[in-house]
Amino acid sequence: MFLREVARRFSLIARFPAGAARKWHAVCCIGGKKLPLLFRAPAIHLKLRKMRFKITPDFSISTALLQFHIEEVPGLSEAQLRSAPGAVSLRLPPGLNYGLRERQEWLNRCVVEELRRQCRLVLAPRVQAWAKRGGVSFNRLTFKDVSSRWGSCSSLRNVNFNVWLLLLDEPLVDYVVCHELAHLTHLNHSAHFYAEVDRIMGILGEAVRRDRELNRVSRSLAALGRYR
């Protein structure tokens, strides 16, 4: 184990071999204080900074799970959001200066928060359905705007997913969901873990195939979402 300092915050990194026990009870002493350690499963890495876009009236997201577009409405004095499961329209007054940094930050926050809401509406039932199909259960489900992973799972049986998961095609979304659900049984990336993913998905060898496809898609997405 070793410590690293990032932006004045400390994190303890523990590395375990594949197949290591999934439950650990450990305490770390830092500055005379005893801190409990939480062993978390390896994550599916996105290898991006947080997704941010240069948002203009032409901005849109069009995937199987989400249709998001911006509409300039004459006579509108303030922004409006029209939302239904899988469909979002951000209505804005015409003539806005989209070059202002403050406006771009606000627009990106609007997109992220609506993605989070859409995840609760669209992805949460999907996660529940896959969990029922696989005969597994979890404690808490959250959706976060993160830069380094599509999803993660903790030893407390909490599962987390990236709000930008909605940018992926449905087969890859399902793979990420099943990947994290499999971590409820195996908190590693061993052969037993991938067999568990295959079991949940119901197709032998599907985990490895989709993992490779997800890596290719992640690399292509690396060219997007880098606006500051």
Protein language model annotation of sequence segments:
Residues 1-20, 24-174, 184-228:
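Active-site-proximal or metal-binding-adjacent scaffold patches in catalytic folds
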Residues 177:
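Walker B beta-strand of ABC/ABC-like P-loop ATPase nucleotide-binding domains
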Residues 180:
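Walker B catalytic acidic pair
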